[in-house]
């Protein structure tokens, strides 16, 4: 028995969807433990693309899939995404999909607040998806959130709504926005209550039972560790913890049940939205990586910023997340380049450093120190065996391993799940 956490080690979009899908075939249970529907991923199965942003990837494989308490759930999006998958022929029932009863809900007022803030009326622009994720987490921490279980308790729901609106209507008055009527919000929730409640469960008990029965549990992270609210490029981060440790608090399982942490990293670096990006290439290389790698957001369609592989950042996240192996993705995007650069350190105010400081000012001032490697002309795309990789590609991978202090466990050579070279099976530990 082994339970595996999958975590992105960059700013998200590392290719977690494909890797989770590949691993879910070996898993019995797949659980989402943080985030909301702000981070999407695409699964390609038998030539069919499935785009997910809230539902666990295991659903497409018919595995028991759980949305944990660490996830904020937009009930309207939940219903829409469920319908879209069902329309594609995926059979989804309450027997294979469960939602934590204590998961907070994203409401229309959260989306309103997110959009107003991001429009620039309130100062710093973070680059959010405007889907209400941050405001929903604020209400969770502020102990005023409406949770899934509240939909089943209609006799107390109105009182909880009124308490929530005392806070939000005060904000809306200050921003010059019309207040929300409590009955209107109650009616909004009642429209979806019957569609979401059949999936509600005490999910920590389900997971505990599965663990005691010796089932393989796969913890599916969203976004990337560099967007973590504590350890990311603050304030240009998300509103939840995205590091591997969140798998425990976001699911209701203790750290002793985790046996392997698999980090996901692209063979180069991308970022969506605002914030520091030391190795960003605003030039032909950046355009090449973006075009070859199809670097556009699944959820927003926004063009991703692109740059060279930053070993400093990945090594930092490997340490913070306790990563035991890396799944390296999109190696094939680098095919054909004459030379490839890797960031091996930074220069900050005239001195060399080997980590990214927490200070917003320092993060903006660091300059990357590069080492240049010879590229390769032969294709790595669709390669299925390690020994068939170009020599220079192998050297590139080995150097990355040396720099980030962990080994490559899986190598992805195309979006197709079959194009995966297994070096170390995370579930074998």
UniProtKB/Swiss-Prot annotation:
<feature type="binding site" description="in other chain">
    <location>
        <begin position="13"/>
        <end position="16"/>
    </location>
    <ligand>
        <name>IMP</name>
    </ligand>
</feature>
<feature type="binding site">
    <location>
        <begin position="298"/>
        <end position="304"/>
    </location>
    <ligand>
        <name>substrate</name>
    </ligand>
</feature>
<feature type="binding site" description="in other chain">
    <location>
        <position position="302"/>
    </location>
    <ligand>
        <name>IMP</name>
    </ligand>
</feature>
<feature type="binding site">
    <location>
        <begin position="412"/>
        <end position="414"/>
    </location>
    <ligand>
        <name>GTP</name>
    </ligand>
</feature>
<dbReference type="InterPro" id="IPR018220">
    <property type="entry name" value="Adenylosuccin_syn_GTP-bd"/>
</dbReference>
<comment type="function">
    <text>Plays an important role in the de novo pathway of purine nucleotide biosynthesis. Catalyzes the first committed step in the biosynthesis of AMP from IMP.</text>
</comment>
<feature type="binding site">
    <location>
        <begin position="40"/>
        <end position="42"/>
    </location>
    <ligand>
        <name>GTP</name>
    </ligand>
</feature>
<feature type="active site" description="Proton donor">
    <location>
        <position position="41"/>
    </location>
</feature>
<keyword id="KW-0342">GTP-binding</keyword>
<dbReference type="GO" id="GO:0005525">
    <property type="term" value="F:GTP binding"/>
</dbReference>
<feature type="binding site">
    <location>
        <position position="40"/>
    </location>
    <ligand>
        <name>Mg(2+)</name>
    </ligand>
</feature>
<dbReference type="Pfam" id="PF00709">
    <property type="entry name" value="Adenylsucc_synt"/>
</dbReference>
<dbReference type="InterPro" id="IPR042109">
    <property type="entry name" value="Adenylosuccinate_synth_dom1"/>
</dbReference>
<dbReference type="GO" id="GO:0004019">
    <property type="term" value="F:adenylosuccinate synthase activity"/>
</dbReference>
<feature type="binding site" description="in other chain">
    <location>
        <position position="238"/>
    </location>
    <ligand>
        <name>IMP</name>
    </ligand>
</feature>
<keyword id="KW-0963">Cytoplasm</keyword>
<feature type="binding site">
    <location>
        <position position="13"/>
    </location>
    <ligand>
        <name>Mg(2+)</name>
    </ligand>
</feature>
<dbReference type="GO" id="GO:0046040">
    <property type="term" value="P:IMP metabolic process"/>
</dbReference>
<feature type="binding site">
    <location>
        <begin position="12"/>
        <end position="18"/>
    </location>
    <ligand>
        <name>GTP</name>
    </ligand>
</feature>
<dbReference type="GO" id="GO:0000287">
    <property type="term" value="F:magnesium ion binding"/>
</dbReference>
<keyword id="KW-0658">Purine biosynthesis</keyword>
<dbReference type="GO" id="GO:0044208">
    <property type="term" value="P:'de novo' AMP biosynthetic process"/>
</dbReference>
<feature type="active site" description="Proton acceptor">
    <location>
        <position position="13"/>
    </location>
</feature>
<feature type="binding site">
    <location>
        <position position="143"/>
    </location>
    <ligand>
        <name>IMP</name>
    </ligand>
</feature>
<keyword id="KW-0547">Nucleotide-binding</keyword>
<dbReference type="InterPro" id="IPR001114">
    <property type="entry name" value="Adenylosuccinate_synthetase"/>
</dbReference>
<dbReference type="InterPro" id="IPR033128">
    <property type="entry name" value="Adenylosuccin_syn_Lys_AS"/>
</dbReference>
<feature type="binding site">
    <location>
        <position position="304"/>
    </location>
    <ligand>
        <name>GTP</name>
    </ligand>
</feature>
<comment type="similarity">
    <text>Belongs to the adenylosuccinate synthetase family.</text>
</comment>
<dbReference type="InterPro" id="IPR042111">
    <property type="entry name" value="Adenylosuccinate_synth_dom3"/>
</dbReference>
<feature type="binding site" description="in other chain">
    <location>
        <position position="223"/>
    </location>
    <ligand>
        <name>IMP</name>
    </ligand>
</feature>
<dbReference type="GO" id="GO:0005737">
    <property type="term" value="C:cytoplasm"/>
</dbReference>
<keyword id="KW-0479">Metal-binding</keyword>
<keyword id="KW-0460">Magnesium</keyword>
<protein>
    <recommendedName>
        <fullName>Adenylosuccinate synthetase</fullName>
        <ecNumber>6.3.4.4</ecNumber>
    </recommendedName>
</protein>
<comment type="subunit">
    <text>Homodimer.</text>
</comment>
<comment type="pathway">
    <text>Purine metabolism; AMP biosynthesis via de novo pathway; AMP from IMP: step 1/2.</text>
</comment>
<feature type="binding site" description="in other chain">
    <location>
        <position position="129"/>
    </location>
    <ligand>
        <name>IMP</name>
    </ligand>
</feature>
<dbReference type="InterPro" id="IPR027417">
    <property type="entry name" value="P-loop_NTPase"/>
</dbReference>
<feature type="binding site" description="in other chain">
    <location>
        <begin position="38"/>
        <end position="41"/>
    </location>
    <ligand>
        <name>IMP</name>
    </ligand>
</feature>
<dbReference type="InterPro" id="IPR042110">
    <property type="entry name" value="Adenylosuccinate_synth_dom2"/>
</dbReference>
<feature type="binding site">
    <location>
        <begin position="330"/>
        <end position="332"/>
    </location>
    <ligand>
        <name>GTP</name>
    </ligand>
</feature>
